[in-house]
Design a protein with these regions (language model features):
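General beta-strand structural signal in soluble alpha/beta enzymes
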Residues: 5-7, 47-49, 105-113
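Generic secondary-structure boundary/loop-capping signal
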Residues: 4, 9, 52, 72-76
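N-terminal glycine-/serine-/threonine-rich phosphate-binding loop
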Residues: 1-48, 58-64
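Short glycine-rich or small-residue beta-strand-to-loop segments that form or flank ligand, phosphate
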Residues: 45-54, 78-79
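Short, active-site-adjacent cap segments at secondary-structure transitions
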Residues: 11-13, 52-56, 117-120
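Ligand-binding beta-strand-loop-alpha-helix segment within the catalytic cores
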Residues: 65-121
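N-terminal, well-ordered alpha-helical segments
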Residues: 33-36, 53, 57, 86, ...
Length: 121
């Protein structure tokens, strides 16, 4: 069976107090166990994910760095969105691949970055 999992950006940030990359990586590891269970049961799994909290954190970091030293560039919101997609996809791809390898499952895990149009309003 083909299964599509939709993970909200908040789902990748289990503890609202811990917004660190390490905390989000640990949440991805926990998610990877469930995904690997589905794959081990013979399902084809695709994952889509949000990025709300992560894109906000990245944007705030970029803006703060620019305030400290205006030589640090600002980036348009679509580019910051791509940063967050790459970062989340990287964590999910690696943790799922690691979990599959632990189980002796040789499957490709791939990440696709999308493009979005953000409404000015």
């Amino acid at each position: 069976m083909k299964i599509v999992l939709a993970l909200g950006g908040n789902a990748l940030q289990k503890d609202s107090k811990d917004k660190s990359a390490e905390g989000q990586l640990e949440t991805c590891r926990q998610t990877a166990v469930s995904v690997a269970d589905l794959i081990e049961d013979g399902h084809e799994v695709s994952i889509v994910h949000g990025n709300g909290p992560q894109v906000g954190q990245i944007l705030a970091s970029i803006e703060l760095a620019h305030q400290v030293d205006n030589g640090n560039p600002l980036f348009p919101f679509d580019v910051v969105g791509a940063f967050s997609e790459g970062y989340i996809g990287y964590h999910l791809q690696n943790t799922i691949r690691e979990e599959l390898l632990k189980r002796g499952i040789e499957k490709s895990v791939d990440t696709i970055t999308t493009q979005v149009i953000v409404d000015k309003n």
